Amino acid sequence: MNFDTFHNIIAGQHRSARETSSGVNPLDRSSLWPAPVATANDVEEAVRSAQEAFPAWSQKTYKQRTELLEKFADLYLAHANEFCQLIATECGRTAGNAAIEVYFAAQWLRYPSKYEISQEITEDDKKTSIVTQEPLGVVAAICPWNFPLMLALGKIAPALATGNCVILKPSPFTPYSSLKLVELAQQVFPPSVLQVLHGHDDLGPMLVKHSRIQKITFTGSTATGKQILRDAAETMKRVTLETAGNNASIILPDVNIKAVIPQLAGGLWFNAGQVCIATRRMYIHQDIFEEVVAQLAEASKDLTSSIEPIQNEMQLVRLKQALADANAAGYELLSLGKTEAAEGFFIRPTIIKNPPPDAHAVQQENFGPIVSCIKFSSLDEAIFLANNSDTGLAASVWSGDISAAKRVAAKLEAGNVYINGPPQPDPYVPFGGQKQSGLGVEYGLPGLLSFCQTKSTYVYK
């Protein structure tokens, strides 16, 4: 299999198209390979093929399906070097950071095999009740550009394990790794069980509105998530949404500053801040505020001296506008790292120092290497400020007292709270957002069950 020509995969076959589009290398803005743009006819054929494959696939046992996922994991890792090169190119990453995603993502192919989905039986004098979990049918997985492999596999694996057929739609900014992933999968799975369609912005709505697709699983912006909810309501589709998180960290005064600063800095700037659970708002106790900000800036110098680019120009423009607005408002900006490279989608990592808590720069999610550092004087104030957002994907608490940190964590309105460590997903732990950061959960047993529908059978004696 070569890694420099790209096709949609429908019914187990390569599909080209009259129209193609090309991604852009974020490092130098050069055009990448042409990829076929799916049409409405392609969508219809993919859905029809998935429906035809569904009966046989869903009738396999859970163990049979997870064994195939394990086999695919081995095959995928055998091509890890090629996927690392693809991720590095389409995302603008260093080879090392591309490898982090490629190898980390393999966990999602293996995690379903650690679970069993069994029926529940209850009995009384009159009847036996049998509760089973059945697959939904055809699932469309709509994925973003920041971690194209990991987030795709996090949707594909549980959907396939539970007996569904999947149509993957990658971001038009980063189609290449997904197209090759599904092409490779044809060596393991029956035709039409896993397909992939690359296209323009009209492709997602075609899938969401399709009457024969039973579920949408989506990661992306809150605005798009809301539109998916509206469109999916017409056919009452199941939806799982993971959307924006303007995530807060609380740094308590008893923290070991020297010990936590490297973790704070690493969490802020990894992947140029293009991480859905990265901190955007950092609330620091007033007694240690200046020291933490100074040490954070110092520790960030090495990390940001060769920071990677923003993945696409659209996001770069948004971030530059956010910094221009913050500067115009008179906020103190600490620009870190080297001067921005003119040829790529680069922006200097920036700390916005103590802006007003209600400032636009604080209340909006800046999806990139920008963090607002804000003073607080009391624990109640910190909790209020952290919760004063319409999003709630992730939060973190940093303290020398674990019991105190747990009490704070219990009061935070976020789906994922991390204590004394940077945010990182785990395939065995449910992951989802509160408020406008999502709907439903992924990963763990609840994530598997989100791709099922419950059937209760009553057998009277």
From Swiss-Prot:
Pfam families: Aldedh. NAD(+) binds at G220, S221, T222, A223, T224, G225. InterPro entries: Ald_DH/histidinol_DH (IPR016161), Ald_DH_C (IPR016163), Ald_DH_N (IPR016162), Aldehyde_DH_dom (IPR015590), LUC3-like (IPR044086). Coiled coil: none annotated. Its EC number is 1.2.1.3. The keyword Ribonucleoprotein does not apply. The active site is at E242, C276. This is Putative aldehyde dehydrogenase FUS7. It comes from Gibberella moniliformis (strain M3125 / FGSC 7600) (Maize ear and stalk rot fungus). The gene is FUS7.
